[in-house]
Amino acid sequence: MGFTEGDGSFIVSTRGNLMFVITQSTVDIQVLHYIEQELGFGRVIKQGHKTSRFIVQDISNLYILIQLFNGNIVFPSKQNSFFQFVSHFNKLSNFPTVATINTLTLPTYYDNWFCGFTDARHRRGCFTCSLLGNSTVYRFRFLLAPVS
């Protein structure tokens, strides 16, 4: 979930088509192939020399993703785009109407959300260990830049 909140998008195109996309540097394309393999659907494409994407467009697999994400989103901005996505999905599909769960999840130290989000936002989050001055005292920190 955290990885998607960092680098994923729920897209409604100007034509009304639905698409779920996770974007990564082509250097990390193996992550996208791993997601494709674990889910058993979607496709990975290269977009230019530096960017690759994992894409899901078919309605039946979008329905599965909606079930996974519904009620499991942390950020209000991602939840808003998800709700718009689900609203369009309900209009387009023959699946039972999906009622969105209007609560935000709070990540804990005991789940993998922080790891996924930090990995996705590799330039905005990191773990550090440093020695303080000339002593043997060290400090561990988790740094995360603000999310817009």
Regions found by a protein language model. Give the residues of each.
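Internal intein/HINT superfamily modules and their associated LAGLIDADG
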Residues: 1-148
